[in-house]
Swiss-Prot record:
Protein's UniProt name: Cell division topological specificity factor
Gene name, Swiss-Prot/TrEMBL: minE
Keywords: Cell cycle, Cell division
Protein's job: Prevents the cell division inhibition by proteins MinC and MinD at internal division sites while permitting inhibition at polar sites. This ensures cell division at the proper site by restricting the formation of a division septum at the midpoint of the long axis of the cell.
Keyword presence, Cell cycle: yes
Length: 84
């Protein structure tokens, strides 16, 4: 085994562990999105329609997130309002 082989094998193990870590992050993110209730997209659409009655905004300017903390659910609504 030459000195170069030692560094090559070490590098590929390092790349594999990095790839594994990235994949775990992606899987965790996907699982988090599946845990959201089915009504959340419709709720976002309804809220957007109500807000549009008063302020002209696009769909990209409203974010609805549901967060579970223990036995409590928190609905967070972020709206980017246009300047007057």
């Amino acid at each position: 085994m030459s000195l170069l082989d030692f560094f090559r094998s070490r590098k590929s193990q390092n790349s594999a562990s990095i790839a594994k870590e990235r994949l775990q992050i992606i899987v965790a993110h996907e699982r988090g999105q599946r845990a959201q209730p089915d009504y959340l997209p419709q709720l976002q659409k309804d809220l957007l329609e109500v807000i549009r009655k008063y302020v002209p905004i696009d769909q990209e300017q409203i974010q609805v997130e549901l967060e579970n903390q223990g036995n409590c659910s928190i609905l967070e609504l972020n709206i980017t309002l246009p300047d007057r």
